[in-house]
């Protein structure tokens, strides 16, 4: 979990912006989206191979 410490003279907006940035870097939202629905192992393998194919031919 991302955690930030708010400074004495720091506004709530800047602290929220900093928190969102740390969450983005940690990949919190992307992980949550991945685990939103169950994905069968066969589907995971298929997506992984398609992504590798895209990287290879790009």
UniProtKB/Swiss-Prot annotation:
BP term (GO), one: translation
Region (Disordered) location: 27-58
Biased amino acid composition, Basic and acidic residues: 31-42
Highest taxon above the source species: Bacteria
Pfam families: Ribosomal_S21
InterPro entries per the UniProt record, alphabetical: Ribosomal_bS21 (IPR001911), Ribosomal_bS21_CS (IPR018278), Ribosomal_bS21_sf (IPR038380)
GO cellular component: ribonucleoprotein complex; ribosome
UniProt feature, compositional bias: Basic residues: 43-58
GO molecular function: structural constituent of ribosome
Parts forming coiled coils: none
UniProt keywords, alphabetically: Ribonucleoprotein, Ribosomal protein
Family the entry assigns: Belongs to the bacterial ribosomal protein bS21 family.
NCBIfam families cross-referenced by the UniProt entry: S21p
Record protein name field: Small ribosomal subunit protein bS21
Source species of the chain: Desulfitobacterium hafniense (strain Y51)
